[in-house]
């Protein structure tokens, strides 16, 4: 819009304030502009800069496009003509409404004053307003971003704090549980498998050193895995010593019974030959019979009584030997077939002796050949017991042991129908590592293995074999 359009637009407002100028001829032009709301609005820097920018764009568009410029100039001419004609015809009406227009102008000026007070940017150019708006938006966005970053940092710190607190509580709970379990396990091991005399002497020797705490204090200073590994190794060692002690006790008892039975067989042999035996017997009953035998050689009644007592003693020793061998057989359950074969050989010898004296009513019923075979069987059983213990001492994997950690084994004619269910109730779910094993078939295969024709056992391995009882706890 060119200058003519502006002049036409302001003509109406000039005429509106014409009467006021006539009534107050002493007022200045500045005061008149201050009371004309349209001029004040146009004089605002923001409006003036905006109008200047719009006018510049309008003129530039007219100059750039000739057709558009011709149309715009024609429109401007029409608007100016219409406005001039309208002002000429509206002059009487404007003169009639002059007081009311003055009142409206005054109210509008007051409202503009308040608006300028509330909106100071109206007194600033558009470039300054745009720059201020950009700065305000940038500050707002920066504040929001900072707030979001602080919230994210706070949430991260809160999450880390909660995680550390939970880790601390969990670690403390696990530590206390591990201490309790290890302590209770060590107490149970000390109770059921006490230390041997050699271990007690070694511990007493170590405690004489400077600044050596008790066993409990030393255990508390060790780590969990060290304590667990030490407990596993100690448990294996004590279990080995315990089982070995049981085997030695059974061996000594069996050999003692075999020695007494051997002396009894020698006594029977002397009785059959009517010779006086040499008093080299350890069993009190055998010594008594040996002492009573010589005086009663000439007394037939006393001779028969001594024979009956000797047979009764032989049967009693055979039964005691049978129970001792059964106890030894119970200790070797789970050992390899070679070790079980030794015990089975001893059992067969004892069964043969028991059959020899089962049907005898007097010493004459015992054949000299059966008596000699019995002595050979006793000597062979004695040697088998020694060989068995030597075999166990040379190579005894702890997985063979059936000691205090296994339930009592009971012989049955046939396996239980619900054997798998019973085993699962004891050991939990079946271990997939052994699911493919057919244990009854393996046991039958072991029993069906032919004996060594040479009567000699295979040589044990020269190297030391590492035996593992609990692979999960072997570090």
UniProtKB/Swiss-Prot annotation:
GO BP terms:
lipid droplet organization; lipid storage; mitochondrion localization; negative regulation of fatty acid beta-oxidation; negative regulation of lipase activity; negative regulation of lipid catabolic process; negative regulation of peroxisome proliferator activated receptor signaling pathway; negative regulation of reactive oxygen species metabolic process
Record's keyword annotation contains Mitochondrion: yes
Organism (species): Rattus norvegicus
Q: Where is this chain's protein located in or outside the cell?
A: Lipid droplet; Cytoplasm; Mitochondrion
Region: Disordered, residue numbers = 1-31, 447-475
**Location of the region described as Recruits mitochondria at the lipid droplet surface in the Swiss-Prot/TrEMBL record:** 456-475
Q: How is it modified after translation?
A: Phosphorylated by PKA. Phosphorylated on serine in skeletal muscle at rest or upon lipolytic stimulation.
Please classify the protein's predominant subcellular localization into one broad category.
other
Q: Which named protein is this?
A: Perilipin-5
User: Which keywords accompany this UniProt record?
Assistant: Cytoplasm, Lipid droplet, Mitochondrion, Phosphoprotein
Which region ranges are annotated with the description Interaction with PNPLA2 and ABHD5? 212-475
Query: Which residues does the annotated region (Interaction with LIPE) include?
Result: 1-123
Phosphoserine is found on 17, 175, 349
| Subunit organization | Homooligomer. Interacts with PNPLA2; prevents interaction of PNPLA2 with ABHD5. Interacts with ABHD5; targets ABHD5 to lipid droplets and promotes interaction of ABHD5 with PNPLA2. Interacts with LIPE.
């Amino acid at each position: 819009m060119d200058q003519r359009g502006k002049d036409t637009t302001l003509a109406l407002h000039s005429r509106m304030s014409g009467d006021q100028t006539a009534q107050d001829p002493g007022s200045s032009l500045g005061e008149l502009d201050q009371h004309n709301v349209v001029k004040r609005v146009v004089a605002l820097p923001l409006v003036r800069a905006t109008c200047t920018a719009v006018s510049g764009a309008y003129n530039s568009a007219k100059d750039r496009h000739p057709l558009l410029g011709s149309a715009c100039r024609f429109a401007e001419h029409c608007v100016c003509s219409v406005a001039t004609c309208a002002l000429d015809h509206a002059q009487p009406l404007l003169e009639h409404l002059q007081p009311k227009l003055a009142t409206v102008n005054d109210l509008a000026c007051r409202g503009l004053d308040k608006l300028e007070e509330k909106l100071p940017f109206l007194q600033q150019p558009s470039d300054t307003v745009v720059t201020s708006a950009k700065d305000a938006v940038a500050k707002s966005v920066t504040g929001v971003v900072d707030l979001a970053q602080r919230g994210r940092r706070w949430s991260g710190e809160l999450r880390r704090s909660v995680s550390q607190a939970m880790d601390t509580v969990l670690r403390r709970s696990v530590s206390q549980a591990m201490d309790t379990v290890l302590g209770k396990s060590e107490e149970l091991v000390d109770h059921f498998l006490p230390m041997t005399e050699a271990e007690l002497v070694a511990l007493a020797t170590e405690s004489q050193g400077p600044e050596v705490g008790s066993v409990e204090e030393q255990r508390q200073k060790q780590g969990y895995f060290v304590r667990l590994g030490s407990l596993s190794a100690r448990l294996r060692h004590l279990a080995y010593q315990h089982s070995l002690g049981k085997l030695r006790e059974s061996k000594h008892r069996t050999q003692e019974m075999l020695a007494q039975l051997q002396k009894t067989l020698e006594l029977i042999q002397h009785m059959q030959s009517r010779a006086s035996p040499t008093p080299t017997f350890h069993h009190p009953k055998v010594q008594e019979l040996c002492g009573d035998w010589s005086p009663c050689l000439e007394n037939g009644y006393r001779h028969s009584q001594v024979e009956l007592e000797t047979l009764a003693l032989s049967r009693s020793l055979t039964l005691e030997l049978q129970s001792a061998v059964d106890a030894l057989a119970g200790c070797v359950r789970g050992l390899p077939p070679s070790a079980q074969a030794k015990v089975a050989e001893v059992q067969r010898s004892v069964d043969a002796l028991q059959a020899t004296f089962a049907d005898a009513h007097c010493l004459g019923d015992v054949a000299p050949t059966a008596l000699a075979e019995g002595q050979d069987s006793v000597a062979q059983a004695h040697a088998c017991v020694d060989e068995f213990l030597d075999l166990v001492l040379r190579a005894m994997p702890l997985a063979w042991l059936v000691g205090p950690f296994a339930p009592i084994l009971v012989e049955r004619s046939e396996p239980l129908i619900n054997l798998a269910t019973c085993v699962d109730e004891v050991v939990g779910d079946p271990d997939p590592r052994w699911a493919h094993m057919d244990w009854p078939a393996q046991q039958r295969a072991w029993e069906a293995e032919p004996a060594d024709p040479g009567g000699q056992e295979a040589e044990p391995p020269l190297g030391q074999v590492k035996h593992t009882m609990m692979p999960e706890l072997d570090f």
